[in-house]
Amino acid sequence: MAFDRIEDIIEDYRQGKMVLLVDDEDRENEGDLLLAADCCTAQAISFMAREARGLICLTLTDEHCKSLGLEQMVPSNGSVFATAFTVSIEATTGVTTGISAADRARTVQAAVNPGAVPDDLVQPGHIFPLRARDGGVLTRAGHTEAGCDLARMAGFTPASVIVEVMNDDGTMARRPDLELFAEKHGIRIGTIADLIHYRLSTEHTIVRIGERELPTVHGTFRLFSYEDRIEGGVHMAMVMGDIRREDPTLVRVHVVDPLRDLVGAEYTGPANWTLWAALQRVAEEGCGVVVVLANHESSQALLERIPQLTQPPRQYTRSQSRIYSEVGTGAQILQDLGIGKLRHLGPPLKYAGLTGYDLEVIESIPFPG
């Protein structure tokens, strides 16, 4: 069964219909049922609970969460895919126990009402909001961001009710199961990768703002500069040699680390590519790209890391949400440079949603130290 076109999925969404979206096999490898929150009814909630069986959640933009005064469920998110749960909610009025389909639909409508204020909701409750990353699936390839993106593109409030699809025996539904589910219920099915691809054809969260030659101790590179429309700041890409989409390209996506890149601090734990080592390796091969991403770490966070240099790396590694943001930004830059296949300077990693950027990791090259 072929996946439906994103254009057709958006049109169904515009008509108030549910759709199925599947993520990458190297991520959750799951499918979620999605519905624009503006179209949520008791019947829709009942169908989701009965047929999909997963946890019914409400995706909201960061701005929307702030307007409702919704705090994160926990101060430090340790979940594998950084799913950003806020505190659970209930409508202040018009509900009884809060768990019925009608009550949950009422809570959703209260949360997405154009004039909604914090007093319209109480906490905790039976609806679980999820805070989407700014930039949507171009920043993080998750169902949370996909829900907000689809609703926005269909002309609704950028918010969706979503639920994971489970099999009768309680196991997670995978692609073959999801295809049968979609056929049984007459629901269109698509992929987050295709949604990323669709958005990239019309919009980006980064924009190229400059290009020039840059002489370095490792040779002359072409320096490309990019403005980040979401996070602010400037990212750079240093390119040597001729880049062709069909040829595997040596690539390092590097987040600026003042402690390591400027003063040469050495961390406890497995060695990884420094900025200078990556530039030297590219120069030795005569062809490759080093993407240098701005570090949005606060001054306070940087100061707190200094005493931890001798501690295990897990004590100061970046959050999963930050990593996904960096992957999305770096992938957009690589796509802009015309790269299709990567020889990745770094340990083997699985990046969610890379297929949506038409990128394929052919090889991972660990640091030789």
Swiss-Prot record:
Q: Which residues bind Mg(2+) 2?
A: 28, 143
- Entry EC number(s): 4.1.99.12
Residues annotated to bind Mg(2+) 1:
28
Which pathway does it operate in? Cofactor biosynthesis; riboflavin biosynthesis; 2-hydroxy-3-oxobutyl phosphate from D-ribulose 5-phosphate: step 1/1
The cellular component terms of Gene Ontology attached to this UniProt record, alphabetical and capped at eight, are: cytosol
- On the tree of life, the source organism's domain of life is Bacteria
Q: List the residue ranges of the region (GTP cyclohydrolase II-like).
A: 202-369
Task: Name any cofactors this protein relies on.
Answer: Mg(2+); Mn(2+)
Give the matching SUPFAM superfamilies: RibA-like (SSF142695), YrdC/RibB (SSF55821)
Give the binding site residues for D-ribulose 5-phosphate: 27-28, 32, 140-144, 164
Q: Which UniProt keywords apply?
A: Lyase, Magnesium, Manganese, Metal-binding, Riboflavin biosynthesis
Question: By what name is this protein known?
Answer: 3,4-dihydroxy-2-butanone 4-phosphate synthase
Q: Which organism is it from?
A: Pseudomonas syringae pv. tomato (strain ATCC BAA-871 / DC3000)
